[in-house]
Amino acid sequence: MVDAGGRCAAEGWRRMEAPPEGADLVPLDRYDAARAKIAANLQWICAKAYGLDNIPEDLRDPFYIDQYEQEHIKPPVIKLLLSSELYCRVCSLILKGDQVATLQGHQSVIQALSRKGIYVMESDDTPVTDADLSQAPIKMSGHMAMVDALMMAYTVEMISIEKVVASVKRFSTFSASKELPYDLEDAMVFWINKVNLKMREITEKEVKLKQQPLESPAHQKVRYRREHLSARQSPYFPLLEDLMRDGSDGAALLAVVHYYCPEQMKLDDICLKEVPSMADSLYNIRLLREFSNEHLNKCFYLTLEDMLYAPLVLKPNVMVFIAELFWWFENVKPDFVQPRDIQELKDAKTVLQQKSSRPPVPISNATKRSFLGSPAAMSPADQPPSTQPLAEGSHRYHLHSEEPECLGKGASTFSPSHPLLPLRQKQQKVSQTEEIPDQRHRSNSLTRVDGQPRGAIGAWPDKKNRPVSQPTSFALHHAASCDVDPSSGDSVSLARSISKDSLASNIIHLTPQNQPHPSAGKSNGKSLLSNVNIEDEDEELVAIIRTDVSPPSPQMPRTSPQAPGLVASIRSPQRQADTLESKPDSFYLEPLMPAVLRPAKEKQITTKEDERGEGRPRTIMAKRPSEGSQPMVRKKVSGGHGSRDLNRTFTPIPCSEFAASIDLAEVGPQSAEATGEGQPLALGRFDTLPQGQAADGFFLHVGRAEEDEGRWYVGSQSPSSHDSEPWTILRQDSDSDVVDVEDTEQDFIGEDHPVVIPRYAGEEESAKLQEDMKVKEHEDKDDASGRSSPCLSTTSQLSSMSMASGSVKMTSFAERKLQRLNSCETKSSTSSSQKTTPDASESCPAPLTTWRQKREQSPGRHSKDPASLLASELVQLHMQLEEKRRAIEAQKKKMEALSARQRLKLGKAAFLHVVKKGKADGAPQPLRPEHFTKEFTQHNGEDLDDGTCKTEGFLVKEEQRDLSDAQDVAFVQLHKPRDPAALHDGEKHRMISTALLEDSVGEVDVNECDLSIEKLNETISTLQQAILKISQQQEQLLMKSPTVPTPGTKNNCQDQKIKAPVHFVEPLSPTGVPGHRKPPRLGQGRNSRSGRPAELKVPKDRQQGCSRSKTPTPSVETLPQSRSLPPSTHPRSPSDPGGELPEKCLFDSYRLHDESNHRTFVLSSCKDANIVSEQVNFKEGLDTSVKEAGLSSSTITGKEHTPVEEPLRSKASLIEVDLSDLKAPDEDGEVVGHESSVELGGDSDQKPGVGFFFKDEQKAEDELAKKRAAFLLKQQRKAEEARARKQQLEAEVELKRDEARRKAEEDRLRKEEEKARRELIKQEYLRRKQQQALEEQGLGKPKSKPKKPRPKSVHREESYSDSGTKCSSTHNLSQTHSGSSLSLASAATTEPESVYSGGTPSHRVESLEALPILSRNPSRSTDRDWETASAASSLASVAEYTGPKLFKEPSSKSNKPIIHNAISHCCLAGKVNEPHKNSILELEKCDANHYIILFRDAGCQFRALYCYQPDTEEIYKLTGTGPKSITKKMIDKLYKYSSDRKQFNLIPAKTMSVSVDALTIHNHLWQPKRPTVPKKTQTRK
């Protein structure tokens, strides 16, 4: 159990602190899907072949870069692929038994897969052969297909449609007819969607249950509650439609993971938004990867980008991952897999069993009476445990079925057999490592200041406790449960939602002095937790102190200190039975009842003995005077029964300590049990404590819980530990509370319980930490935002711890970042300081030292006499005043910043001027502030959240540093502690940056801003002075000869580990190039404070937008640590507190992005390369980040000047080079100096850049020259490339423009020609009509036969011959039908609808004639004759009929002339077809009026001639090949002949009429060709 707990907590921390590896995400435009596919496939196959941890070194990264910077696959990898070894290994894992032996070579693997129904096919569906796979040079596509096939085989082994359906049936229903998946991908989508729907259902139930109590009218209004609920965003469980597209944000998969492993993956940790930003998706994907690495044997073989961009080529990879998830959750089912619905049932059962097995503890009559306010309340409590509703205990936050009592409903008589908080016990058993579900309560609504319990408190149950480790499960789970959850959606900075004074004071009231007088019911002498443990996350209190005073039980409804060492039943991270998530449904089995007001204790006659029950001897803690607001937890321990005052801030302890603390914890209960049968139960409210349970303690952190448990147990171990002390809750806001607690704790330990000595090793530290943490957190809170955010306050230990444990609720990404930044910073420092293992150094031992110093300074820390308590009170008072002071300062700064910001907007020129001047003087550092501020102004809407919190964090730390009087130079002062101007300058910058950051959070009146413009001017002048000084110093420095390296440098190397990790950030390019934006976070250890993964989570899109580098508080980390090291150990400036990274990475990790206006640095010293590079990079980063953190630019130069830096200086001297000459003139923005960075983010104008070269004293000057030359070459090359690219682009654009112009011209010409042609046709038509009229009048046929229209024909030929080739349909004519059917074919096949196509058909015809090749008519004149005639005939004009003389003229209603023309000039044109044509034209003798041509198909090959009778609608054959008659049903398409165009056009009609000239019949009516068919019919053009 313990392990589970430890694991859980540790996971939480890991989740929060793991450095974001994806900080430098590859932007989509630079993401190469093909390369990603190769990398992912190779990683998968190597991992499967060798096991992820045993992959040979040279295969881990399959790519290498040659000297031309081209990327290639490494030869060993290629060799392996060609040899088929990998494939055989992996395939053997899938195959069974003797089949494995046959695997030798590619072919056998291909065959083995095909036997399983999986075929190795390339993307174009060509099968991959052995030859493809053995081919050299390697044919990668074949190998990728092979790996995909193996992945599919793996997938098929792990998941199948049947398995998915069986799995889904267990927790959901579905419609077999509609929803059954049809393939594996669909099955995966089906499974994921069903789990997400189930999660929706669970969360909806929880929300309803939560709202029920809230809506109940019985709630009394006394309670102070903020209604943030509506603002909270419920988690959105997405449903997938497309596996790749919709699953790429990781949310759906994480919801599945949460469903199966609610303890390992808290719902609060997952970012479940309806429209997740890129940062949210990244965060989720990272979370998924971490979970897989930690619990699923590292089965996530993709990069963040692969998942985020989800290219289709990676579908097999994603599918194999999902299959593996399914396999783990449904087949393997390790211990941590406990699906939520099933787990809820189990939890409920466990609770019942534990209830029944709990040893009876006597409860005094008085206590029982005190609970008997109303008969209603009795019921549940009295029921035998077995009858208690199952999940009740498990789900109510109150932790026990007797909830009603808690609710204040009234008192059920608690029979000893089921103590009030049955869960407690269970939890205890389950894991001592659990955190207590601190009851969060609203400020002093719990107890009045006068100490009278409010009856209303009973109404509180709606505030369910939530394991700290999971602060608020996603606010929506129980929105009510957090007043102001740090995670609540609206808190921009956690602090925001709470007003400073109210909280601090409130909670202080809860502390022992203000506690209500001893509550009426101390049943069995165990006093009730006097104030409910509060963990509001926003208004959290830190510790629960046991004091003799304990408020009446009603107050305690929610407290749960009962587990032996766990106050308030520390909930196991597994939250057995408590976690909302795990048992949502049953969470509230009983409705909340109104609280019953009980008479004040003073009015009752119950004696202490009665209250205690049977007058057992118990030590009573002296009542605390309630006069002071600083809770001093003094306890008189009478009779040697030391009351255990476990008043502690909760600090997480690293896992390494878990074991120890756990042992203690476990020992505790036993010894406690040994002590005697009845440990009194915490005031009735709390359920009797079985003897083994010490009712004290309340941790926010699992780790802490254990520590405290250990300790607490110790307390309870002593036989005399029966004493009952009420629990007091300390508000962490009062700093000294913690101090007091600890002191008292120690007092009590020292005096009465030698046993206590076994405190686990880390404990001492943690105690120290607490005080410091508290201070720090206060600072965080106040400083950060000028408001007290209880979250950040010491209490934030509570929330922060809880957050730290990985369950920060993410309502909005920014909040999460913020919370993590602040709370985790504190947490990490705490936990790290406790670490005793060597790696702990990573975490930040340095601060530890500081804390230790601080702790030693704090008088009461170790002293065991009351005097120390007094001192602690003073400290507390001091802290409170300090808080107020800070708040005021923050407000002031905010105003100044606002004005500064406006000023910056207006007076950019002034700043630039200063900057340039500074640069000329050789101190470019100061330039950054403007850059940074400007960026802020531009992007203030975007990154503000982060920025604010980071800056706040920095300020906090800075003040903390001031408070603790560290001897080292402050970060800001690093440059030159003695230089007041610089310091002042630094301060100003800090103010400006803070203000800028905060400004976005809350706007201040513009008028007020004007007031502070003067200050800004002052700042500017100070800045100028500072710049001058710095430049002078720099010059001096350069002139000085470097000193010999001192041993300090050596220390430095060792100290690197200790120093706080520094956050290196390269200044962003003004254009916001995403690639340059990565905060490398070189030194960031897991616990480093400044670098929470939060930054990482900054949405990439935002990152691109704002060029501000995001280093939350580079200095923050460094400060305490640097303080703790003596100056000699600082070869580097504290600002550069050596990263923990191995030296080798430092150099590489910092590519200088010359293109993006960063400074360029070349490091020449190799011995110190990593140190120098850190500095250099840091310098780059600092320019921005320092400003961001609110430091003066002088800090940067500090590196060169600080005495501490002496060793470093000795190694390398600084040479400044102007880079402007290194850069090709037209290379825009490639090496841009700081000025440009000062300008707007998007401004990429070229500015001269300054490069720093560190010159190693021992190296020859020529080495420097070489490097410079190389650098110049590189620059030049880049410039040329850029030039070439630019030229190429311009050429392309020009070409496109020409093309467009040419097309427009053609269109214009075509239109003009068309117009002219139409005019000609019209004229011709009018002329013919006139002739026809004349003819009808008997004037005789005009003599103008075919010759007249010739000009038209000629004209057309001329005008179109040039454009014919351009005509759109010319290509249609290339249909190669033999014979003369060309124009027919063209019309019918490719543009059958040409009827509607406007003018194009005519073009087509013209172009036909214009292209002799296409026009098969041997003589042009015939064409022209025909054309004239056809025009006439189409008008039914007999006058123009030019058929052979032997025919009689057709009547005007006949289409005979048209058919005649069609056959002679189109269907059967040419000499070849002449005999056939003539035989058909003999039909002229036929009497029929209307003829129809039958075509074979859309190609318009002539087949037969038919006669059509319009009256009877009969169509019968005259000659040719085809059916004897054609009915309506047989007709497929209808055509009309256009005489002037000599082509048939498709008619969109379906019914026959006299306007139809040709038709086709359905294809199936044609029989295969018979040899008898004359070939002539085939020869169509």
From Swiss-Prot:
InterPro entries: CAMSAP, CAMSAP-like_CH_dom, CAMSAP_CC1, CH_dom, CH_dom_sf, CKK_dom_sf, CKK_domain, PRC_barrel-like_sf. The keyword Coiled coil applies. One of its GO terms (cellular component) is microtubule. The modification Phosphotyrosine is found at Y1516. Residues 351-399, 424-470, 603-649, 765-803, 821-866, 1064-1143, 1225-1251, 1288-1315, 1332-1428 are annotated as: Disordered. Residues 899-918 are annotated as: Sufficient for interaction with calmodulin. Residues 603-617, 765-785, 853-865, 1092-1103, 1225-1237 have a biased composition (Basic and acidic residues). The modification Phosphothreonine is found at T511. It comes from the Eukaryota. GO terms for molecular function: calmodulin binding; microtubule binding; microtubule minus-end binding; spectrin binding. One of its GO terms (biological process) is cytoskeleton organization. Residues 792-803, 826-837, 1373-1390 have a biased composition (Low complexity). Residues 1104-1132, 1361-1372 have a biased composition (Polar residues). Residues 1443-1576 form the CKK domain. The CKK domain binds microtubules. Belongs to the CAMSAP1 family. Interacts with spectrin via SPTBN1; the interaction is direct. Interacts with calmodulin; calcium-dependent it prevents interaction with spectrin. This is Calmodulin-regulated spectrin-associated protein 1. It comes from Mus musculus (Mouse).
